[in-house]
Amino acid sequence: MEERTALRELAQGGVLLTCRALESGWPARSLTRALRAEGWARLQSGAWVEPGRAADPPTRLRAVQLLNPRLVVSHRSAAALWRIETLTPTTEARLEFIDPALSFRGKVKDVRVRRTPLESGDVALRYGLRLTSPLRTVADLLRSLPRDDALVALESAVTYRRVGGARRAPLVALDAVMAALASPSQGSARARRWLGLCDPRAGSPAETVARLRMADARLRPESQVQLFTPLGRRVVLDFLFRREGLAVEIEGYAYHGTREAHRRDVSRFNQILQCPEVRSLLRFTAQDVFWNPDRMTAEIRAALLAAG
């Protein structure tokens, strides 16, 4: 009996292609029995994930790319790999690819393939996957996404951010994005107009959307304002309506559940109210920003009117 290569040895990044196992000498019937007996999970037709490995987006991307090597991970899928924030949770988004050969005609569930050319500088390698570069990724998102989502991605990419528990440096420069959008491709003209709304100082997706909602309501505060308390302590506000002395703070999704975190929050807000420029303070959660923006802007407007 011919000795067979172990299935795990044939896997690539935890993904086994059926065709690879068959080519190595596994009979089809024996292969199916072995996959089920060992606990492999089917990702899609022709691809399996090894036992104990989650079928997460990177693993699913790998399966699609192994089956279709010419495809390049792109758009929101590439953004997630570069740790560029968007408004769509990675687990809910379709897998997105570009086919630079313009020849892909297949259909895969929960996968979108765009047929468009790519320059050599548009493609990078990360985690063993071929994907669009940060610059190309941001340009594609600006061309294809709605305004708020596009600007969340842009502002995430041009500044330092903590994403997934790790801090990363800026990935692109704003002038490089502007140059990348200079060509007359679909969506570029609209994207160039949106560049004027970008604030590289934004610290989170919630801050980006809050600022856009305020702008839509004709409320235009200063953002990321540095102030000092009478004791010389530095405080950076999310937003400040300086004439009215109104500070606006946006809290992220993370729940500060520890006693020490709560103490720091209380101390920070006390320090804000000690600043001579601040006479009142409004705090909103990310949920307020995303789900009740009209109420948020109404409260801000009422506070501004009360301040005279």
Task: Please annotate each region the language model reported.
Residues 1, 12, 25-30, 161-308:
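Surface segments flanking catalytic/ligand-binding clefts of nucleic-acid enzymes
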Residues 1-187, 308:
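Short gly/ser-rich loop at a beta-strand->alpha-helix junction or flexible surface loop bordering the NTP-binding
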